[in-house]
Amino acid sequence: MSNQPPIGVPQGAIRLNTDSQKLEFFAQDRWYEFATNTPNLDGGSRGFVCGGNVPGGKTNGIQSINFATLATDTGFGDITSSRGGPAGAASRTRGIAAGGGTPSRVDTIDFFTMATRFSGVSASDFGNLTSGRSFDGGGLSSETRAIFAGGTTPSNVNTIDFITIASTGNAVDYGDLSGTASQVGGVASPTRGIFFRPNTNLEFVTIASTGNSQDFGDLQSNASQCGNGYGNSIRGEYSGGNPSTPATARQSFIFATKGNASKFGDLLVTRDNHMSASSPTRCIIAGGTVSGSPSNQIEYVNPTTSGSAVDTNTSFANAPSGAAGLSNAHGGL
């Protein structure tokens, strides 16, 4: 479009430039492009811990951590009921906490808006799982779909359910794990989800399809009581757990390439029944049991580099274990 105005254009007139698709205003005999900026109103990249077991009972609390500053918010809001062992998943805007025990197993699926801090109950009813069960991990997601695997009813099951995160409604059968399992861990890239059962098996699903999980490779050690996994869009990790004695190892694998996990470093402490949350460059591992006692300590790793974890010098309240871990910046987005 011409930068010269037609005759009679008033000062302050506004137009859409059809060549640049930008808004312009007229001043001093010329058209000028508006300076525009879209502020980030979602609070930045944050991880969340929902529900879980705490000393003396269970909690419905939602707590958050800012990945950049490592500052925690221990009163972000609440899921709809106090329960241990929910599974977590998320898109960029919506967090999901599914199932758990009150102590009886529930089929409840809650959702909440991660950009909005609430006082009191902040989660809403999304729908129901195909059966009531407790996970202690077992969730993963892309931007559009969340998948939940295994758990106890109280018997161990191999069920895989999925939901479409942006909608509401009941979960739908996706397929089955290769065997029944409780305390299944999960982590995802945008296209592929990896589950690790309480043995050395790594199994994968293609998130956008349905069907049974398939063999991916093996961990170096048993994945019992490891909580959920973490990582970026290229690399997933599992760490800690209690194969026979609590462990510290970071075990890493590349989503696009099937094969065995390799050691990538260590956590600061032996930890099991913990929860994790991810951003592209910083992943937090928090809570759970450390040396047999409940812990509220948080450590972090960089998923792009090997090495030991770093203490955040921050903490979550009430030392949660078996909680849902999720974020608005994980590797599946």
Predicted regions and their residues:
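Polar, enzyme-active/binding microenvironments
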Residues: 1-333
